[in-house]
């Protein structure tokens, strides 16, 4: 079940558990994380960063919709997270795909900007 981060944190608080966040770089990662989450009946965060795309490993427009679709069909609570998005266009693209949470990486930007 696709959820936002507030829903995931609420479950973590109710069950007194930590939630794993896993950076996804291929389809096998998605399967491994979600199959294990279902087996353990644990909520999970699937994350994707810009780095795999910059390194030409995987593109957001290829893997993002698959991540969202698989989260929607699963029995466990899953948040889709854009991890370390370095520009607003890329973050907007992740939200358009269906991601439910983002983290803007501004460490390379000067304080003046």
Which residue ranges define each predicted feature?
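Hydrophobic faces of well-ordered beta-strands that scaffold small-molecule active sites
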Residues: 19-23, 44-48, 78-84, 102-104
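N-terminal low-complexity or amphipathic/hydrophobic leaders
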Residues: 26-48, 53-56
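Active-site-adjacent beta->alpha loops and helix N-cap segments on the catalytic face
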Residues: 31, 56-64, 84-93, 106-113
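Glycine-enriched alpha-helix->loop->beta-strand junction motifs that scaffold or abut catalytic
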Residues: 40-42, 96-102
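N-terminal amphipathic alpha-helix/helix-capping segment at the start of soluble metabolic enzymes
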Residues: 1-20, 64
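Aromatic/hydrophobic pocket-lining residues that form π-stacking "cages" and hydrophobic walls in ligand
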Residues: 8, 33, 67
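Alpha-helix-loop-beta-strand connector modules within alpha/beta enzyme cores
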Residues: 57-80
């Amino acid at each position: 079940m696709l959820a936002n981060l507030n829903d995931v944190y609420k479950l973590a608080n109710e069950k007194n558990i930590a939630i794993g966040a896993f950076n996804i770089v291929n389809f096998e990662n998605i399967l491994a994380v979600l199959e294990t989450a279902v087996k353990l009946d644990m909520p999970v965060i699937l994350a994707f960063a810009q780095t795999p795309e910059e390194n030409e490993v995987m593109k957001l427009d290829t893997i993002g919709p698959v991540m969202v679709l698989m989260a929607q069909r699963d029995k466990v609570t899953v948040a889709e997270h854009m991890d370390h998005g370095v520009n607003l266009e890329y973050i907007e693209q992740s939200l358009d795909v269906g991601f439910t949470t983002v983290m803007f990486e501004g460490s390379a930007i000067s304080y003046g900007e």
